[in-house]
Amino acid sequence: MKNKLLTAGLIILVLGISLASVLLQTNYALALSSRSAEVAFLSRLSGMFIVGLLFCQIVLLGSYKKIKVFFTALTLILILIHPLLTVYQTKLIYGRLDPFYPFTDMCVLCPLRDQIITLGRLAFWAYIAAIAAVVLKATPWFKENWQKVHALVYVAFFFGVAHMFLIGSDARTPLYLYFFTILTGVVIIKAVRKLRS
C-alpha cells in the first residue's frame, strides 16, 4: 500500500509540474487571442504531458500492469494528437492542409529548427514501434525479441526530451528544468541497468 501511494504521489508530482510549467509560461491574453494561439497552447500542453507520461511508464509503473496499459493508451492518444495539432495550426496560419507532414517529413541536412522537429518525429516512430512490439509479442519472431524492440521506449523518451528542451519554451522554466533533469538522469540510470542485464 505504501509503494502504491508513493507511486501515485510521484505521478501526480510529475504531471503537476508538467502542467504548472505550461500554465506559468503562458501569456493568456496571447494564448486566447486567436484559434492558432489556442491550438499552439494545446500542442505545448500535450507535449509536456507526453514526456511526463513516458517517464511514469518507464520508471514508476513497471509492476502496475493495468495502470501502465492505461498510461500507455493515454500517451499514445497524446502522441497522435500533438502532431495533428501542428497540422491544424499550419492550416490556420498558412491555409494549407498536409496531414502527413508531421509524421513523415524527416530532415537531417536542414536548419536547426527542422532537425529539432525531426527528433520529435523519431520519438513518435520509436514509441509506435515499442507499442507494436508489445501488441505483437505473441507472434513467433516477437515472442523472442519483443523486449529488445520495446526498449525503443527509451529512445522515444530521450528524443522526446531533446525535442522538448530544444524547441519548447515551457521546458526552460527553472522548476521544470531542474526537476526533469533529475528525472532524465533516473531514466538514463534505468536504461544503462537494462542494457547491462
Which residue ranges define each predicted feature?
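Membrane-embedded alpha-helical bundles that constitute the cytochrome b-like, heme-associated redox core
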Residues: 1-197
